Amino acid sequence: MESGHLLWALLFMQSLWPQLTDGATRVYYLGIRDVQWNYAPKGRNVITNQPLDSDIVASSFLKSDKNRIGGTYKKTIYKEYKDDSYTDEVAQPAWLGFLGPVLQAEVGDVILIHLKNFATRPYTIHPHGVFYEKDSEGSLYPDGSSGPLKADDSVPPGGSHIYNWTIPEGHAPTDADPACLTWIYHSHVDAPRDIATGLIGPLITCKRGALDGNSPPQRQDVDHDFFLLFSVVDENLSWHLNENIATYCSDPASVDKEDETFQESNRMHAINGFVFGNLPELNMCAQKRVAWHLFGMGNEIDVHTAFFHGQMLTTRGHHTDVANIFPATFVTAEMVPWEPGTWLISCQVNSHFRDGMQALYKVKSCSMAPPVDLLTGKVRQYFIEAHEIQWDYGPMGHDGSTGKNLREPGSISDKFFQKSSSRIGGTYWKVRYEAFQDETFQEKMHLEEDRHLGILGPVIRAEVGDTIQVVFYNRASQPFSMQPHGVFYEKDYEGTVYNDGSSYPGLVAKPFEKVTYRWTVPPHAGPTAQDPACLTWMYFSAADPIRDTNSGLVGPLLVCRAGALGADGKQKGVDKEFFLLFTVLDENKSWYSNANQAAAMLDFRLLSEDIEGFQDSNRMHAINGFLFSNLPRLDMCKGDTVAWHLLGLGTETDVHGVMFQGNTVQLQGMRKGAAMLFPHTFVMAIMQPDNLGTFEIYCQAGSHREAGMRAIYNVSQCPGHQATPRQRYQAARIYYIMAEEVEWDYCPDRSWEREWHNQSEKDSYGYIFLSNKDGLLGSRYKKAVFREYTDGTFRIPRPRTGPEEHLGILGPLIKGEVGDILTVVFKNNASRPYSVHAHGVLESTTVWPLAAEPGEVVTYQWNIPERSGPGPNDSACVSWIYYSAVDPIKDMYSGLVGPLAICQKGILEPHGGRSDMDREFALLFLIFDENKSWYLEENVATHGSQDPGSINLQDETFLESNKMHAINGKLYANLRGLTMYQGERVAWYMLAMGQDVDLHTIHFHAESFLYRNGENYRADVVDLFPGTFEVVEMVASNPGTWLMHCHVTDHVHAGMETLFTVFSRTEHLSPLTVITKETEKAVPPRDIEEGNVKMLGMQIPIKNVEMLASVLVAISVTLLLVVLALGGVVWYQHRQRKLRRNRRSILDDSFKLLSFKQ
């Protein structure tokens, strides 16, 4: 049997007995209790060492007032007890905060949770990462179950329930995973509100032997274990909001719960429920192994970059000093701290940093010998000055992509470049890091290849073993510093200011002062074996990180393996290097805001009338400080190896999907069309361009692209360059696709939503999206969709059979292999021009986009070169997307979008299915913004009130009502067709597009999956962002109907959830029945393909049947031998007991005889 078939066969055998365990039974007694929780028990901002009264920002959250709650709230949390009397509480570490106790288990173990609810409303406990049946899911939603299977869904006040969870091999950490995986548990009656109320805790599942036999168990592979929740805890969603207002506001009647400033004061930017450094100290020893279990929860604003100052983390084999955390994202990071001291942990998202998401951790020497100095490399000296300049965001004066004047009236660019008595225009005072030749700071360094750096400082480069020495001269008017990522430094050289208890509260240069920084690159700071040869990092000023970086002080830093840099300091094996910073530079938060307003001679009377519009005009959506393709053109040759070093910075809206039009890139050996950036994250993407022409680099988030976050790169055929071998293609597959206009219903059946919420219509979360009352449009909209036809006559639609039913609004799943030519014959049967444009493929047209007018037929040819298919670390197939690109934003929101999968050669079978999978599902998670559809006015006329003119299209409620939080165009479990059999191999193509709010963390209940990045990693949540396309694979193991949903709070309530069903193996014998509230549909089993036979629920090639039978026979014989051996042991024990009884009987008789004789 081939290794791939053997692997899947063994995985399937494992799924046959998911609950067979050979480990311990770990029993926990958890009580749900109401408590009073203080987010800042020390009563001050610990980071700045300021009392609340003198800290304006901290006091806005923590000081109570007549209409402010302050820093103390009633919450409901999980507590652990020693037994079922629930009287003797188990003490928890103080730093765990309001989190529930840490639940721990190994593979093969059973976890029994005795849950008792001492609170005043129903709650549950629902886990991630473990196996459970319906009676232990702890999640309330309509799933067709009843009776005892629903008892776990809602434990009433005073009630109790026992939850039974197991950790079978199908949920175990993989070989590539760390010894223990990070998960969570939480209440799931109304999950967003339950969690906001406080019901959440950590859970780890470990490999066998990772835990010792103590109670509670301790890990044997690490010395310290820490669990941190990063979350903007929204107390406005707490079940106790009204009670908290009544208790803590001195004038409760004056409170307006809809007031935005009141709501903001209740959003606590917390780590484990503590803000502004109030988290009790996290202590550890230098040179000891530390495991950090990091997780997030919350809403769209919960984009977190946790920065560990002074140390290095390892996650999934890669070195980093930051961790990206999103709602229901779990990160397991390992650290061996080297530098003693008190260090900062902070979320580097600007607004979160400002609002208190910071804590301290302390590394003690613990009498350890100081580490051996392993710095055997060079001392690399840099002379860098902070220099104030006037910066022009659009020096060309026109859009480099379209040629239009930036100040063209009515254009989007005019909003940013208009110069008037109420607008500054495109030129601002800023400050920039600049490189000089020596310590005299007389002669600047000018390199032609650095022209594209723009506002960025010079590139600092070093290899492992090197020392970086930076002489920093602050020639600006504010104190500034230099704080690096990715290198080591002692406390004396740290560039961030905070209260660490030392005499060095941050090395900062005052105006016209020089300071020297010393950073080192020991071996444990360099790239790992899984990392590329060079790692991309960043340095920035952190005297005031938010104002300093918005003023312009940021630059790139490159750390490479020893020998990776040439004599000229450039990376070997790379022809071109480009460093690009994607950020919305907020000039309102610059040190020079007042100076810029004064220089523009603004009329402050006009400003006061439109302060919001003025502030928005100062938020510059820039790449290296340039908008609308004004970045100097990035030139390269066809076949070059190009390294793109990408940097992120900013606030929670700075979620950037960096798209490379015309060519693809590799990230860590995985093929991508986009690289995701968040504040203080860094990515290196490798491109080998094979597509000649001029293309855009842009942020995929639609509003960012519209606002000018675009640049141009050019690929030329250069003389003297060795021609790359020409890829050979062969005609392979033809698709006939029509754009047709339909009436689309996002939620044709509201029964699931109504049963789930069990509320009146107006009180339902879905009312605003689904009602057609009060001037709202309801759930039905005119849209345009891609649909497949049988041939070029476009007369017979290709029917969507069972496997395609789930596609919903999406066009057909187009598939190809490397080396194929895909031909798409497109007929536009809609009422306006549309096109078909695909990511990832090599489009043969020289005109982009090639549009079809209404009634016109256009043929597209897509070649599939090697760089379109899976990279060395990818799965067998990678997912892409296609859509109409005449107006990419309006066309897509109108409905014209579909999935595309490109596979390795030989993976696809003649009928188009994958030979290595039994099922394939393509899911698009997108907030369809009907306000940006071409058909908005028609929809208002058709579905609005009788007088369409009475509807205010800019009304906030109306705008929100038209944002449909959909999975394949359906809300509230209306998507059908996600059905599979137990033991089947399932590939999920997970797609996301849209805006910065399209942050989606998708959780599969009851199942885990494998995510491939060179190695396989276990997860049950996949993170999606605009322009990201992921492939995850699972073996369906748990029969039942289960929930799949986005874990972002607002998205849950808005209906971004659906059901998938796993049918048991016995149901293979009968038609597969999908029960809905509308009708019952029978979906016949898939046909058995020629040359295959069906065994164990799988289609097995005939040539492998004998081998699989042999494996099954061997397993059967092994089990038989085990049974015989156990039987022998039992017989032997029984015989020994019988002999002992006989001996005792003989002895008794002997004693009696002796007694008688005496």
Curated annotation (Swiss-Prot):
Ligand binding (Ca(2+)): 134, 152-153
GO molecular function, one term: ferroxidase activity
Positions of transmembrane segments: 1111-1131
Cell compartments where the protein resides: Basolateral cell membrane
Gene3D superfamilies: Cupredoxins - blue copper proteins
Extracellular compartment spans: 24-1110
Result of changing residue 616 to A: Decreased affinity for Fe(2+) and decreased ferroxidase activity
Residues with Phosphoserine modification: 1145, 1150, 1155
Subunit and interaction comment: Part of a complex composed of SLC40A1/ferroportin, TF/transferrin and HEPH/hephaestin that transfers iron from cells to transferrin.
Membrane topology reported for the UniProt record: Single-pass type I membrane protein
Cofactor needs: Cu cation
Tissue spec: Expressed by intestinal absorptive cells (at protein level). Also detected in breast, colon, bone trabecular cells and fibroblasts.
Glycosylation sites: 164, 236, 588, 714, 758, 829, 873, 931
Cofactor binding summary note: Binds 6 Cu cations per monomer.
Name by which UniProt lists this protein: Hephaestin
Entry-linked CDD domains: CuRO_1_ceruloplasmin, CuRO_2_ceruloplasmin, CuRO_3_ceruloplasmin, CuRO_4_ceruloplasmin, CuRO_5_ceruloplasmin
Plastocyanin-like domain segment(s): 24-206, 218-366, 370-560, 570-718, 731-903, 911-1067
Gene encoding the protein: HEPH
Catalyzed chemical reaction(s): 4 Fe(2+) + O2 + 4 H(+) = 4 Fe(3+) + 2 H2O
Binding site for Cu(2+) 6: 1000, 1046, 1051, 1056
One cellular component (GO) term of this entry: plasma membrane
Disulfide bonds, paired cysteine numbers: 180-206, 285-366, 534-560, 637-718, 877-903
